[in-house]
Amino acid sequence: MSRSVWKGPFVDAYVLKKAAAVRESGRNEVIKIWSRRSTILPQFVGLTFGVYNGQKHIPVNVTEDMIGQKFGEYSPTRTYYGHAADKKAKRK
């Protein structure tokens, strides 16, 4: 179920503070965040966020297409190695 419209998008306060500080300084640096649940807002377009996936920070360059989605969607947490191959079939 999606979030109610009257509540507005959820963004952790520290993400807003860090984004405002980088915008104000004019530097193009990676903003490290741990909040995968925060929604991407229009004011984040053009910034680079390092979204934590449990092991490391994955750099995410925010574009206009990403507005309204969550940061966690762009930082996968699981590694897919493929299905195990059948060893008997490989030998033939």
UniProtKB/Swiss-Prot annotation:
Keyword Transmembrane helix included in the entry's annotation: no
GO molecular function annotations of the record: rRNA binding; structural constituent of ribosome
Entries under Pfam families matching the protein: Ribosomal_S19
Keywords, ordered alphabetically: Ribonucleoprotein, Ribosomal protein, RNA-binding, rRNA-binding
An individual GO BP term: translation
Record-linked InterPro entries: Ribosomal_uS19, Ribosomal_uS19_bac-type, Ribosomal_uS19_CS, Ribosomal_uS19_SF
SUPFAM superfamilies cross-referenced by the UniProt entry: Ribosomal protein S19
Ribonucleoprotein keyword on record: yes
GO cellular component labels: cytoplasm; small ribosomal subunit
The organism's place on the tree of life at top rank: Bacteria
Function per UniProt: Protein S19 forms a complex with S13 that binds strongly to the 16S ribosomal RNA.
HAMAP family hit by this protein: Ribosomal_uS19
Membership in a protein family: Belongs to the universal ribosomal protein uS19 family.
Name of the protein in question: Small ribosomal subunit protein uS19
Taxonomic lineage of the native organism: Bacteria, Pseudomonadati, Pseudomonadota, Alphaproteobacteria, Rhodobacterales
GN (gene name): rpsS
